[in-house]
């Protein structure tokens, strides 16, 4: 397996970064995960635009143009012969020696790019059967719109869910539902798709954006606004979405069944529309038997 370190492809076991890298010491950087189907990137431009936007919000300069970055990632995918999988890439602010919270005034730090590509098949069974979630207080910072390397709050929530045999932790600030530890959450109520507004309290997921777009195109009403824990528990359907899990239904929340405990009809419809977008961009998909 080869990985990308700046503009070089190297064997994973030979890849190194400096111990004084601010990404390692502070989590000072941004990242993206881009999905591949049939060896083709899906919603690549949207992901890369968000990467550069996240970097701009923290005054981090990505040391490559978008065109150069695309060429590097294409080489990474080809070298590892990825068909259906994920590309993880991150850019840190770079090396500062000695370590200091304050950035140096006399010279700009040079950002460090790393990336890896792995084969990860689609989990068709999960898309249909779904899984459970827990609810957890959202204790993260107030700039969740930045896809930052700082993920400790997400990690703690996700692992708490895992310990309770749940797929996800649905986060809330008081009564207001925001998103999940590693995905967005949406509900269906009276035929309306309801999801939190794209503000500083959530990451505006790329899959979330595609879902909203296909819903509107196909006559499903969309409401981008706050909803409460009560709304969540009384929803007709609940699903989570992200680059890696596509659209996955939530059948139980905190041990309580959602509606009839099965994937709802609008969730199924939205996933069909979503798959149509994938096929349009990347070609026909192989389905798990």
UniProtKB/Swiss-Prot annotation:
Pfam families named among the record's database cross-references: Aminotran_4 (PF01063)
Keyword Transferase tagged: yes
EC number: 2.6.1.21
Active site: 147
Modified residues (N6-(pyridoxal phosphate)lysine): 147
Cellular component, GO, one term: cytosol
InterPro entries the UniProt entry points to: Aminotrans_IV (IPR001544), Aminotransferase-like (IPR036038), BCAT-like_C (IPR043132), BCAT-like_N (IPR043131), Class-IV_PLP-Dep_Aminotrnsfr (IPR050571), D_amino_transT (IPR005784)
Names of the cofactor(s): pyridoxal 5'-phosphate
Binding-site positions, substrate: 31, 99, 101
Record keywords: Aminotransferase, Pyridoxal phosphate, Transferase
MF (Gene Ontology): D-alanine-2-oxoglutarate aminotransferase activity; pyridoxal phosphate binding
Family: Belongs to the class-IV pyridoxal-phosphate-dependent aminotransferase family.
Quaternary context: Homodimer.
Stated name of the protein: D-alanine aminotransferase
Organism encoding this protein: Listeria innocua serovar 6a (strain ATCC BAA-680 / CLIP 11262)
Organism placement in taxonomy: Bacteria, Bacillati, Bacillota, Bacilli, Bacillales
Gene that this sequence comes from: dat
């Amino acid at each position: 397996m080869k990985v990308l370190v700046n503009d070089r492809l190297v064997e994973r076991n030979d890849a190194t970064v400096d111990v004084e890298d601010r990404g390692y010491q502070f989590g000072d950087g941004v990242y993206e995960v881009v999905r591949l189907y049939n060896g083709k990137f899906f919603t690549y431009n949207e992901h890369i635009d968000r990467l550069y936007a996240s970097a701009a919000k923290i005054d981090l300069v990505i040391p490559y143009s978008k065109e150069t970055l695309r060429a590097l990632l294409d080489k990474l995918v080809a070298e590892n012969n990825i068909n259906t999988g994920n590309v993880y890439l991150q850019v840190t602010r770079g090396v500062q020696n000695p370590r200091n919270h304050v950035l140096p005034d006399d010279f700009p730090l040079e950002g460090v790019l790393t990336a890896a590509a792995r084969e990860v098949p689609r989990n068709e069974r999960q898309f249909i059967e779904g899984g459970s979630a827990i609810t957890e207080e959202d204790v993260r910072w107030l700039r969740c719109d930045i896809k930052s390397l700082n993920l400790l709050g997400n990690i703690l929530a996700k692992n708490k869910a895992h310990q309770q045999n749940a797929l996800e932790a649905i986060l809330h600030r008081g009564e207001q539902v925001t998103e999940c530890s590693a995905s967005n959450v949406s509900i269906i109520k009276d035929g309306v798709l309801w999801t939190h507004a794209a503000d500083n309290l959530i990451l505006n997921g790329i899959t979330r954006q595609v879902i909203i777009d296909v819903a509107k195109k196909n006559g499903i009403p969309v409401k981008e606004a706050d909803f409460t824990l009560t709304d969540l528990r009384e929803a007709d359907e609940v699903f989570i979405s992200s680059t890696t899990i596509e659209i996955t239904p939530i059948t139980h929340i905190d041990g309580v069944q959602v509606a009839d405990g099965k994937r709802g009809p609008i969730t199924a419809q939205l996933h069909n529309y979503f798959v149509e977008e994938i096929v349009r961009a990347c070609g026909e998909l192989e389905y798990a038997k």
